[in-house]
From Swiss-Prot:
Name used for this protein in its record: Lipoyl synthase
SMART domains to which the protein is assigned, alphabetical: Elp3 (SM00729)
Domain Radical SAM core: 68-282
Gene that this polypeptide is encoded by: lipA
Chain positions covered by the region annotation Disordered: 301-333
Length: 333
């Protein structure tokens, strides 16, 4: 009998091959402590009473306690089915439902109801749409800004096929941070992300930086990459103008997904954080349980501080740079 995926379709060949490897046992350091405070309890109460939906809860994110305590949350837009399949991602692939044009308003109302200081908006790829879903991402940013002027918005986008018009629509909505995740290294990129292209992902970040946006990306470890390849990918990201970086451990969602090639120890994550700083990233979060939206507002503020410092150094005589101190850019969050 042919094996089937939970959504009823036959397993892809790569899924059947992956499923031959049992789910790996997690090491002792892949765990989180339950730490709740008044802000977390308040946000949780608002979410429950209003029937709101966040990626934080529905994906079982281990960082929900910290993020909600900081009044930060992540929302998924565009539906629950992606037109692309990445070998690490738990979101189903297939034919999505029709676009919900009211979704941006509802997300913005959720952000306002929860009293968020910072919201991350991510979503599925919508290659079935003429604009790739760019309007949906842009409109969600606009709606949040309109209802919650003091809330920072980070948008994590697909590559929109690298099309400047679709990317430009999102850029013009002026999110505080434009994120696009590279995720892995060139040698295994096509296997892990067959519908994406390594250079195209770098070009998305390059275009966003040229548009003046704060740029951010993520690299997943444990997919089969080498240390030298990680270093090359980090250099490529910096060369593309990427300012903020998260480095994460791959956690296999189901047996159908890519096996975990190795568990990266916490000390190595610290090393990659130092490498990122040495390469010139304005902010780096690197750890086994870090996710791309983890402590997002803190990273954004680090990027703004670095930009202000750069402007300060450019506006004073070289001999006086070391004598000038510079405070952090004012921020409501």
């Amino acid at each position: 009998m042919t094996a089937v995926a939970p959504e009823g379709r036959p397993l892809l060949r790569i899924e059947a091959r992956n499923a031959q490897t049992p789910i790996e046992r997690k090491p002792s350091w892949i765990r989180t402590r339950l730490r709740t405070g008044p802000q977390y309890q308040d946000v949780k109460g608002l979410v429950q009473s209003a029937g709101l939906h966040t990626v934080c809860e529905e994906a079982g994110c281990p960082n929900i306690y910290e993020c909600w305590e900081d009044r930060e949350a992540t929302f998924l837009i565009g539906g629950e089915v992606c037109t692309r399949r990445c070998d690490f991602c738990q979101i189903d692939s297939g034919r999505p439902a029709p676009l919900d044009h009211d979704e941006p308003r509802r997300v913005a109302e959720s952000v306002a109801t929860m009293g968020l200081r910072y919201a991350t908006v991510t979503g599925v790829a919508r290659d079935d749409l003429a604009d790739g879903g760019s309007w949906l991402y842009a409109e969600t940013v606009r709606q949040i800004h309109a209802r919650s002027a003091d809330t920072g918005v980070e948008v994590l986008i697909p590559d929109f096929g690298g099309r400047p018009d679709q990317l430009g629509e999102v850029f013009e909505a002026a999110p505080e941070v434009l994120a696009h995740n590279l995720e892995t290294v060139p040698r295994i990129f096509r296997r892990i992300r067959p519908a994406f292209r390594y250079e195209r992902s770098l070009d998305v970040l390059r275009q966003a930086r040229q548009a003046g946006l704060v740029t951010k990306s993520n690299l997943i470890l444990g997919l089969g990459e080498t240390a030298e390849e990680i270093h090359t990918a980090l250099r490529d990201l910096r060369s593309a103008g990427c300012e903020l970086l998260t480095v994460t451990q791959y956690l296999r969602p189901t047996p159908r997904h890519h096996p975990v090639e190795r568990w990266v120890r916490p000390e190595e994550f610290l090393d990659w954080g130092r490498v990122g700083a040495e390469l010139g990233f304005s902010g780096v979060m690197s750890g086994p349980l870090v996710r791309s939206s983890y402590r997002a507002s803190r990273l954004y503020q680090q990027a703004m501080t670095a930009r202000d410092q750069d402007r300060s150094e450019m506006s004073v005589p070289p001999e006086s740079v070391s004598e000038n101190s510079h405070g952090q850019r004012p921020s409501p969050w």
